[in-house]
Amino acid sequence: MRGNVGFYGYAAGPTVHIVDYYALADPLLARLPAKTKWRIGHFVRIMPAGYPETIQARSNQIPDSDLATYYDHLHLVTSGPLWSAARLKMIVRMNLGRDEYLVARYVDRLKAAGYQ
């Protein structure tokens, strides 16, 4: 996990997966709200529990059921078989905002736990 992944990611090569906590290159983190203290271009996200393990294991390890479901749907869109019917249906579903409530409930739980 690190920020400013451009040069580092290039130098690390194609076999290294870097979780970008600024969310510039991460589909899940880019859809989560930024922490309250930020500066332009540096919107740090709270790293969801189980997310680094999910990336490493290549299977969903996120304990929050709403965020885990959202991740599964998003992963199908971003990494599923290109022309599969399931992926195309999920693209429509996500573009219509039908899964936004999953992120909203996750964020509500974060706020209730004291995260800002």
Residue spans for each PLM region:
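C-terminal luminal/periplasmic domains and tails of membrane-associated envelope-modifying transferases
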Residues: 1-116
